[in-house]
């Protein structure tokens, strides 16, 4: 510090500047001090001057001091020398040596206490005073008084009283204001609610069934639209092409109903006038489809507003592709005739349209405005030159409270067939409607007309859509519709010609749209015959198409149109499942009869005269095509399917019969616009080819021009043709149902075509469903007369199932349309096409496509329809060239799936063109190879698009289904959850699978879920797919046994297509099983199915003796199977249906569908389709049961996969191959338990490479399952027993994913987070519990609960287990894996923990949360369903699925259902690619089945 204070140093030298030196580093300060000299006014300056200093002089004595300013130096804070030390000393002294204060010195304990007491006393006194004073405080006046007197005076004073009054007044005022405000709000809310309710009521009333009172009574009918709307929705979205099938609102509504429905008769002037009491909300518009003028696509969306927007299924959109119709000249003419009528009614419609202005706006999605649609319709009507009856249209306007306003109002456009007997009596409208129905949808219209009477208009309008959505298969398949529409068969006969004329086209088109939405609301639909809704309830196929809902008659709308679809709207979404379940069960028995009679009515109607038959076939086929298609697009898609299929089928029939079938076909095509657009042409072409005489030229024309379209159409037509082909087939076997068996294949085919044309609506609806669910084949056979009749039980059941699974199956049905149709045609074509395919092929083989379209007459009719759907898919995705082609070719494949089955499945699924070019070969080879390949293709494509054309073809077929689904899916890929989901999945698969595997898988799923083709394709396709990949050479065997058995339909087709490599008898057998299952007509099914199934069984018996017993069991269980499992699409897993079959499945289906429409639906669809196939195959002999199982199996496919192991285990005890069959059969017969069979064969088929698979398939009837299993993964094949359960769903998903390679893509895309899985499982559990309750009651009533339940659980368990195996281990999300494990373990623990050869796997499964499965009481059911002990199941084959015994235990009620739903979704999406991996892929899952080898049996072995 010395230097710092140097200036103060005495020693310092003052002489120089050294003392003033600036410190370094302060240049700025230094500069500043130098720049600024001291100022003269500075006090220092002045002092210096006083001393004699002058400016400029130096300082100091010698004046040598500094002259410049004194430097500024930074001074540090220094107290001075020693100051700091001193301060520190003070601080230390103060702190460390503190002195004691005086007070402290004096303070003692006593003093402290004294102070404390004093303070306390003071405080107490203060408190007391305060309390005292508080008594004299006026709060109101805020015044403190010290004395009591003062306070009293104040209280009594006016001042205080006045303040009190003011205060009270203010409080009262405030309360009043608040209450008045709240009251006003309440009133406003009430008013709004009232308005909403009023609007809803008006809308509901506008859709009241003719004789049933308001269609939607808030309490009576709030049932989901059965996926009809959903299908339509899907159709709308999937059939983006537009729906010429926009329906006039109330024209079809029965006026006698008066108020509820806005029946706008689209007569010249009557329009709304015709519906005097009906709300003027109906917009009826004719959609004209001039041949010359390709009409714009008209989009019609049917959306039933419901308080719960949850039911997307309520939304349906229908698109009619006018271009397709344009392609089908005949179709156009009927359409135009219809259009004439429609236009005649257009004024009314327009008035109605004004009422439904928004709807109208919405309506012309693609096709301009309602007016244009109406004018088109009028033109179509004029072109159709429909007889006296003008088409009537129903237009459903969604209630105001509808959250989801459809792009298009629910327009139920139904072209009435000839006035149905009932309809004629009921309405003057009937005549116009008859006219309307007459032209486009002879059969559908007839059905509706006959069965609907007053409801005819409603029914007709809704017939197709309703049939489509409500009862997809009108004739055989439409459970409710089939019953009602089939009822309309009598009238159908009378209406036949008209129906053919107008109904087909317009009804197809309109009906699909309008009918779907309105028909569902209208009446359940008295399709059974002329009978109207005589009872309070009518069985209606739910969206899943597997369950028959007991639909309130008042909600039914019956259409005259081919699928005399009674589409019932359930805006409030009341659940009629119970009745539906009952219906499914009763109708399992009843429907075979009803549908059988209905089918017979149809068939008889058709049989009596070719026109009738044509109409019948067209109707049935239409129902199938449109219905089945509608099945695919339950709401929109179904509508589309109906339209397209119906026009396609109807056209094919009419082309043959009337040459108007083409318009019908077109209509139908128009119906399923997007999907059907291509399909329509394809179908048109197909039908044309089928009806070469009438349509060869057109076929060539349409075929070349619209090959992809035609492929779709072909699919469609295939569906249609399938019905006719099956009809031919039916006649060939002379099924009882084939009233007018045309031994001459041409004639039969003409009839079939006619039937197909008519039937496509019915069979499309019914057949499709039936085929998809068992009704499809029924429809095919219904179209084929006998099978069509046989299918009724199945059809109805399937229709119910499909309706239930409409969402699923409608989703599927989009695919279901194709699938159903394809399945129908496959089943029938396999069966009949195998039998007739060659002949049919030869007859129709004027062109490969002719064969493809024609030869598949039935098969192609079905498949054409399917392919049409596919082609629609294909064409819809034409942009996706690969898929377009694959899909086209897949369509071809799809149709060829049938075609190959039918055309001799010689053709391998190697090339797109091969599908067509090798149609014959395919038919031959398809028996095992095409069916196998085709299926494999379908599966393959579905499963792994990359799987070469083989798979692509199959996949494309799957996609075609997807296409149908896509229709739906486009509209409601959410699977509108279930139906839409499937449909969309299908369409989605078609579109997206082209680009993505995921949709494809779903497509596959849906495809499988679809119908028999879905099951078959799913089953066979999966098997095929895996076969294609792994067992190409074994394909025939595998396909034959797996597909032949499992996919009886395909194998049937192949079997019938004796050219197939597989044993003809088995093929026949399979075909029969398939066909009979598909046909499900009691007689038809029994005779044809018995025949074919006998062959099949004989073939199979060698392979699987239990199969016969189980098939027999399945037969007894027809009531059970009657409960069609909703198609997979309805809700991914069909396990509930498998368990409760109907109730369980629907509930679960809804959950899965809603929850994961895509995945679940795919899985479910796949599984279900597969199971259907399996069921159908398995239940071939018991046609009804088979058909029922066709639907059930799809559900069971889902269920089956989960349940598969137990059945297989049970079977295993008997025989590895035979055992699967037995469980399958057992599950099949116990409709609720279809999954078991599927699973059996899911597990069993996979184990065998080809022979094992064959044996498994044959014996286990795991053909479908096996298909599912095999497709699950070529790798998975080694886990046949394991893969199927998981793989089935997986395959289902995989089918979609198959497009990419294995299901994994779809599977993978559909991944669930653990939370999702948990939620889903919980949801499913809840649904399951609910379903279980219902189902238990139902099962106790309808059929052996134990038998029904047992298979379901096994299916369920296998599913979750197989799923992981199927799905690539890596693909399936860990969550999925965990859930699968959870469910599998739960199922295993709950079901399989008990008597299981592999306790470890069960234990492993057990570790999976057991709650879901625990409730499932399978013990009694399993035993009844599965003859063998659980040990047997396990003993024979390492199918280590959840032990059958584990499944057997009674404690497990139906909880496995959620697993199936959950697992298929979770696991199914990624089954294919990771088939092998999947099995290995999830240690968790693996542990579940590791002990059992459930996961690895075939796959690992292989």
UniProtKB/Swiss-Prot annotation:
Q: Which residues form a coiled coil?
A: 89-124
Which residues are recorded with the post-translational modification Phosphoserine?
491, 653, 738, 740, 758, 911, 914, 981, 1009, 1014, 1033, 1035, 1081, 1107, 1175
Q: Where is the composition biased (Low complexity)?
A: 868-896
| Annotated Basic and acidic residues bias | 182-206, 323-339, 424-436, 579-623, 653-670, 693-707, 750-772, 1010-1027, 1042-1059, 1093-1108, 1159-1171
Q: Which PROSITE patterns match?
A: G_PATCH, ZINC_FINGER_C2H2_1, ZINC_FINGER_C2H2_2
Database matches in Pfam families:
G-patch (PF01585)
Q: Which stretches of the protein fold into C2H2-type zinc fingers, per the record?
A: 136-160
Example GO CC term: the record gives: nucleus
Biased composition regions of type Basic residues, renumbered to the chain: 671-692, 708-720, 799-809, 852-867, 919-928
Region Disordered: start and end of each range? 172-251, 323-391, 419-541, 579-1301
Keyword Repeat present in the record's keywords: the answer is no
Q: What InterPro entries does UniProt report for this protein, alphabetically?
A: G_patch_dom (IPR000467), ZnF-G_patch_domain (IPR052445), Znf_C2H2_sf (IPR036236), Znf_C2H2_type (IPR013087)
Q: Give the compositionally biased regions (Pro residues).
A: 733-743
MF-aspect GO terms: mRNA binding; RNA binding; zinc ion binding
Compositionally biased residues, Acidic residues: 223-233
Give the position of the cross-link Glycyl lysine isopeptide (Lys-Gly) (interchain with G-Cter in SUMO2): 311, 577, 1105
Q: Give the stretches traversing the membrane.
A: none
Enumerate the SMART domains for this protein: G_patch (SM00443)
All copies of domain G-patch, residue ranges: 40-86
List the protein's name. Answer: G patch domain-containing protein 8
């Amino acid at each position: 510090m010395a230097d710092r204070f140097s200036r103060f140093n005495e020693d310092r030298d003052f002489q120089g500047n050294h003392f003033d030196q600036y410190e370094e580093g302060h240049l700025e300060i230094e500069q500043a001090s130098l720049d600024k000299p001291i100022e003269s006014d500075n006090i220092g300056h002045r002092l210096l001057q006083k001393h004699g200093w002058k400016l400029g002089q130096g300082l100091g004595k010698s004046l040598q001091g500094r002259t410049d300013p004194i430097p500024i130096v930074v001074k540090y804070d220094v107290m001075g020398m020693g100051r700091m030390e001193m301060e520190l000393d003070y601080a230390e002294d103060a702190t460390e040596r503190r002195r004691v204060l005086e007070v402290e010195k004096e303070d003692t304990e006593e003093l402290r206490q004294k102070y404390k007491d004093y303070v306390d006393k003071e405080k107490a006194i203060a408190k007391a005073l305060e309390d005292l004073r508080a008594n004299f405080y006026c709060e109101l006046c805020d015044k403190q008084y010290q004395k009591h007197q003062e306070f009293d005076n104040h209280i009594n004073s006016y001042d205080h009283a006045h303040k009190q009054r003011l205060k009270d007044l203010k409080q009262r005022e405030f309360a009043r204001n608040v209450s008045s405000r709240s009251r006003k709000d309440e009133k406003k809310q009430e008013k709004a609610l009232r308005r909403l309710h009023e609007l809803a009521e008006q809308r509901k009333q506008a859709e009241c069934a003719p004789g049933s009172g308001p269609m939607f009574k808030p309490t009576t009918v709030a049932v989901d639209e059965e996926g009809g709307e959903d299908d339509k929705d899907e159709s709308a979205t999937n059939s983006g092409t537009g729906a010429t099938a926009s329906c006039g609102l109330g024209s079809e509504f029965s006026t006698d109903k008066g108020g509820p429905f806005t029946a706008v008769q689209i007569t010249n002037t009557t329009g709304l006038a015709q519906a005097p009491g009906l709300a003027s909300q109906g917009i009826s518009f004719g959609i004209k489809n001039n041949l010359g003028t390709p009409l714009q696509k008209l989009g019609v969306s049917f959306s039933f507003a419901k308080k719960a927007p949850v039911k997307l299924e309520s939304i349906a959109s229908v698109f009619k592709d006018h271009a397709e119709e344009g392609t089908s000249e005949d179709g156009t003419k009927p359409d135009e005739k219809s259009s004439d009528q429609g236009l005649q009614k257009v004024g009314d419609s327009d008035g109605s349209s004004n009422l439904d202005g928004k709807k109208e706006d919405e309506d012309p999605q693609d096709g301009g405005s309602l007016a244009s649609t109406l004018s088109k319709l009028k033109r179509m009507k004029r072109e159709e030159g429909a007889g006296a009856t003008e088409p009537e249209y129903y237009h459903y306007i969604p209630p105001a409270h509808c959250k989801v306003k459809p792009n298009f109002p629910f327009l139920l456009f139904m072209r009435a067939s000839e006035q149905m007997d009932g309809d004629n009596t009921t309405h003057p409208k009937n005549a116009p409607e008859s006219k309307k129905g007459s032209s486009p949808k002879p059969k559908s219209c007839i059905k509706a007309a006959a069965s609907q009477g007053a409801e005819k208009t409603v029914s007709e309008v809704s017939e197709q859509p309703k049939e489509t959505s409500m009862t997809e298969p009108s004739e055989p398949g439409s459970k409710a519709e089939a019953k009602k529409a089939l009822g309309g068969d009598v009238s159908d006969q009378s209406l036949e010609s008209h129906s053919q004329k107008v109904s087909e086209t317009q009804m197809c088109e309109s009906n699909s749209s309008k009918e779907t939405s309105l028909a569902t609301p209208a009446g359940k639909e008295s399709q059974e015959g002329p009978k109207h809704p005589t009872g309070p309830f009518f069985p209606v196929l739910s969206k899943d198409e597997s369950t028959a809902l007991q639909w309130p008659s008042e909600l039914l709308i019956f259409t005259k149109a081919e699928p005399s679809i009674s589409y019932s709207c359930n805006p409030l979404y009341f659940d009629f499942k119970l009745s539906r379940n009952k219906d499914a069960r009763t109708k399992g028995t009843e429907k075979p009869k009803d549908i059988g009679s209905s089918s017979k009515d149809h068939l008889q109607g058709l049989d009596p005269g070719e026109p009738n038959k044509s109409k019948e076939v067209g109707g049935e086929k239409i129902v199938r095509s449109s219905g089945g298609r509608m099945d695919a697009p339950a709401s929109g898609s179904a509508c589309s399917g109906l339209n397209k299929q119906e026009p396609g089928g109807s056209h094919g029939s009419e082309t043959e019969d009337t040459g108007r079938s083409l318009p019908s076909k077109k209509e139908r095509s128009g119906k399923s616009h997007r999907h059907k657009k291509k399909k329509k042409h394809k179908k048109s072409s197909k039908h044309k080819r089928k009806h070469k005489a009438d349509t060869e030229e057109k076929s060539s024309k349409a075929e070349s021009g619209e090959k992809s379209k035609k492929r779709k159409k072909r699919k469609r037509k295939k569906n249609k043709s399938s019905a006719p082909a099956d009809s031919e087939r039916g006649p060939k076997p002379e099924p009882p149902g084939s009233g007018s068996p045309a031994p001459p294949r041409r004639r039969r085919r003409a009839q079939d075509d006619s039937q197909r044309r008519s039937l496509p609506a019915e069979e499309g609806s019914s057949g499709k469903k039936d085929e998809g669910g068992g009704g499809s084949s029924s429809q095919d056979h219904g179209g084929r007369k006998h099978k069509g009749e046989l299918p009724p039980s199945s059809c109805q059941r399937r229709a119910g199932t499909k309706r239930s699974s409409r969402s699923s199956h409608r989703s599927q049905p989009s695919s279901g349309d194709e699938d159903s149709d394809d399945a129908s045609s496959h089943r029938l074509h396999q069966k009949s096409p195998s039998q007739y395919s060659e002949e049919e092929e030869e007859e129709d083989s004027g062109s490969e496509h002719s064969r493809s379209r024609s030869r598949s007459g039935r098969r192609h009719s079905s498949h054409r329809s399917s392919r049409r759907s596919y082609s629609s898919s294909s064409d819809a995705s034409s942009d996706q060239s690969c898929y377009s082609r694959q899909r086209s070719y897949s369509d071809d494949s799809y149709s060829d799936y049938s075609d190959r089955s039918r055309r001799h499945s010689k053709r391998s699924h190697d090339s797109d063109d091969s599908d067509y070019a090798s149609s014959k070969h395919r038919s031959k080879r398809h028996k095992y190879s095409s069916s196998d390949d085709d299926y494999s293709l379908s599966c393959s494509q579905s499963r792994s698009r990359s799987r070469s054309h083989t798979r692509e073809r199959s996949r494309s077929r799957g996609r075609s289904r997807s296409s149908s689904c896509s229709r739906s899916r486009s509209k409601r890929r959410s699977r509108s959850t279930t139906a839409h989901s499937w449909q969309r999945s299908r369409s989605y698969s078609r579109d997206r699978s082209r680009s993505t595997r995921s949709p494809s898988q779903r497509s596959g799923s849906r495809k499988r879920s679809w119908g028999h083709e879905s099951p078959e394709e799913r089953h066979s396709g999966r098997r095929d797919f895996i076969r294609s990949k792994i067992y190409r050479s074994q394909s025939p065997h595998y396909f034959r046994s797996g597909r032949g058995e499992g996919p009886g339909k395909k194998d049937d087709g192949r079997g019938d297509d004796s050219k197939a490599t597989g044993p003809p008898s088995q093929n026949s057998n399979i075909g029969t099983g398939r066909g009979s299952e598909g046909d499900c007509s009691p007689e038809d099914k029994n005779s044809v199915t018995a025949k074919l199934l006998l062959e099949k069984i004989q073939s199979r018996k060698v392979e699987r003796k239990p199969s016969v017993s189980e098939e027999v069991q399945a037969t007894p269980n027809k009531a059970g199977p009657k409960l069609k499992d909703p198609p997979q699409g309805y809700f991914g897993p069909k396990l509930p249906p498998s368990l409760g079959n109907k109730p369980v499945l629907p509930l679960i289906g809804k959950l899965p569908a809603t929850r994961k429409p895509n995945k679940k639906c795919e899985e479910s669809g796949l599984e279900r389709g597969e199971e259907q196939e399996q069921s159908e195959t398995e239940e071939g002999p018991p046609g009804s049961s088979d058909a029922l199982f066709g639907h059930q199996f799809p559900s069971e496919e889902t269920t089956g996969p989960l349940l598969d192991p137990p059945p297989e285990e049970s079977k295993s005890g008997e025989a590895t191959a035979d055992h699967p069959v037995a469980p399958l059969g057992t599950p099949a017969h116990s409709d609720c338990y279809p999954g078991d069979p599927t699973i059996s064969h899911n597990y069993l088929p996979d184990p065998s490479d080809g022979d094992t698979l064959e044996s498994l398939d044959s014996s286990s009837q795991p053909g479908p399952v096996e298909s599912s299993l095999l497709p699950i993964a070529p790798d998975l094949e080694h886990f046949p027993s394991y893969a199927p359960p998981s793989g089935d769903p997986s395959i289902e998903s995989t089918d979609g994913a198959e497009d990419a390679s294995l299901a994994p893509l779809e599977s993978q895309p559909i991944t669930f987070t653990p939370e999702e899985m948990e939620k889903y499982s919980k949801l499913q559990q809840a649904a399951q519990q609910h379903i279980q309750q219902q189902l238990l009651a139902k099962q106790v009533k309808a059929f052996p609960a134990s038998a029904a339940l047992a298979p379901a659980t096994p299916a369920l368990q296998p599913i979750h287990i197989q799923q992981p195996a199927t799905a690539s281990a890596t693909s399936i999300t860990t969550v999925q894996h965990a859930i699968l494990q959870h469910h599998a373990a739960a199922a295993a623990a709950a079901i399989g923990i008990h008597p299981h050869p592999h306790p470890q796997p069960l234990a492993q499964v057990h570790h999976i949360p057991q709650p879901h499965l625990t409730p499932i009481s399978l013990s009694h059911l399993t035993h009844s369903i599965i003859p063998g002990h659980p040990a047997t199941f396990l003993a024979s084959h390492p199918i280590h699925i959840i032990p059958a015994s584990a499944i057997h235990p009674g404690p497990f009620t139906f909880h496995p259902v959620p697993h199936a739903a959950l697992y298929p979704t979770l696991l199914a999406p990624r089954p294919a690619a990771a088939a092998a991996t999947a099995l290995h892929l999830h240690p968790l899952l693996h542990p579940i089945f590791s002990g059992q080898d459930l996961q690895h049996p075939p796959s690992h072995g292989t």
